């Protein structure tokens, strides 16, 4: 999927997968860059009759978030909160029913989050910050774009589905 691009410093994207005739799983990704840093957030919910509703109490889900630039010489120094509101981390953690880890490479970061149990919208949301750095100099790179992509596998009784990848691109 090709990322949606914004001329401004913020952008968002959604992906859906149908569960049945009236229900869909939605993943939403937002990215914004300013002041040398990019923020991102993701949120997952059901959409029933056009309205967002939380996932059911017995949900297990795994979300993958990829953060990168189209410039292969940009390193993403990422910290994130999983779920939203938890203390920011840069490696991985266990926050109650949410387990996460981060895998880094020279030009991208992958945040993998496992959710156990349903609940509020916030429980299936992740937010964070990336400092795009030039690999050669270690200095902030505000010339290149920032791409945030996410997909999620959601399982609960009778359902085991994975969304398409939602990608958004923004610039400083």
Question: Would you name each region that the model predicts?
Answer:
Residues 76-130:
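Extended, solvent-exposed segments with strong compositional bias
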Residues 122-157:
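Internal, hydrophobic beta-strand segments that form the core of beta-sheet-rich folds
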Residues 32-39, 148-150, 166-170:
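Sequence contexts marking disulfide-bonded cysteines in secreted/extracellular proteins
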Residues 156-172:
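Short beta-strand elements
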Residues 41-43, 64, 147-151:
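Beta-strand secondary-structure signal
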Residues 1-58:
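N-terminal prepro-regions of secreted/extracellular proteins
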Residues 59-63:
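Short beta-strand/loop motifs in extracellular/secreted proteins, especially
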